[in-house]
A protein has these predicted regions:
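Long, low-complexity intrinsically disordered regions
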Residues: 1-149
Length: 149
């Protein structure tokens, strides 16, 4: 997804809700709220640290992957970077650890919410029209599957 389409994508995937409104309408779970607010308050946070802070470990909270995936699918949270641990010589090793952030933190609140004046369905139609021009052989069902996830 190119930068210019992120506001419409967020508007469509969020169904026109900012996170607080989604919570107020009873459409978000307590665990989602806790994860979202922790990331939003910190700015950026490694998954390892996030799991520790919210007690997602053996004998603690469960469902971290489910909640974080849902928040990503709704475009309230995204992976900002992958950070590699370092050995005693300062060399990176192993798998990268996801660093989560909100799109608002990465791109700015005004930019992310710039499509909020549109109906989410209008944002969807704009994205579909763009994808049809880029992927002329794709069916509408295939394109919808791409943007819905």
């Amino acid at each position: 997804m190119s930068r210019e389409w992120i506001p419409d994508f967020a508007n469509f995937r969020r169904d026109g809700y900012d996170f607080d409104a989604r919570w107020d309408d009873g459409l978000a779970s307590y665990k989602d709220k806790e994860l979202y607010e922790t990331i939003a308050d910190e700015g950026r946070m490694l998954s390892k640290r996030l799991k520790e802070a919210l007690n997602y470990r053996k004998g603690g909270n469960t469902g971290f992957e489910t909640c974080i995936t849902r928040l990503q699918m709704q475009s309230y949270v995204c992976i900002a970077d992958f950070v590699y641990m370092q050995d005693k010589y300062g060399r990176p090793y192993g798998w990268g650890v996801a660093e989560y952030a909100t799109p608002e933190d990465l791109f700015g609140y005004d930019f992310i919410t710039s499509a909020y004046q549109r109906d989410p369905q209008e944002s969807k139609e704009r994205i579909l029209k763009h994808l049809q021009s880029r992927l002329p052989n794709a069916t509408e069902m295939q394109l919808e599957k791409i943007i819905k996830g």
